[in-house]
Amino acid sequence: MKVPVSVIIPVKNEARNLERCLQSVGWASEVFVVDSQSTDGTCEIAAKFRAEVIQFKYAGGWPKKKNWALQTIEFTNPWILLLDADEVVMEGAAGEIAEVVRRGDSIVGYWINRRFMFWENG
């Protein structure tokens, strides 16, 4: 069963990163990829994972795109998770998010600690 969480992933030419990110949020009931006219196959990757692609004409920095998405998209879920395309939700974190959402307590927001990992090219 999918977890009632809406995921927003703002992108522009993120084909290199997007597949891994989308694989990590397959548990979420809806995923929105907010694109700014990518030319590298980003939208095709999003479609492969059945994410809804929404175009946003890029006219500013990431905060503007994020705020536009939060104000414009009609979410079906009370919980929203914002991710960059180069971020992934680890399996343990996905389980914790699902538990919090299913509990339905009075908490309205969470801070998720991040772990930074770097890979060498080649």
Where do the model's predicted regions map?
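N-proximal low-complexity "stem/linker" segments adjacent to membrane-targeting elements
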Residues: 1-24
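A conserved acidic beta->alpha catalytic loop
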Residues: 24, 35-45
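Short, structured coil segments at secondary-structure junctions
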Residues: 27, 49-50
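A short, glycine-/small-residue-rich helix N-cap motif at loop->alpha-helix starts
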Residues: 57-64, 70
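Acidic metal-phosphate-binding loop of nucleotide-sugar-dependent transferases
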Residues: 60, 85-89
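Active-site nucleotide-sugar/metal-binding loop of Leloir-type enzymes
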Residues: 67-79
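Conserved donor NDP-sugar-binding/catalytic core segment of glycosyltransferases
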Residues: 78, 88-122
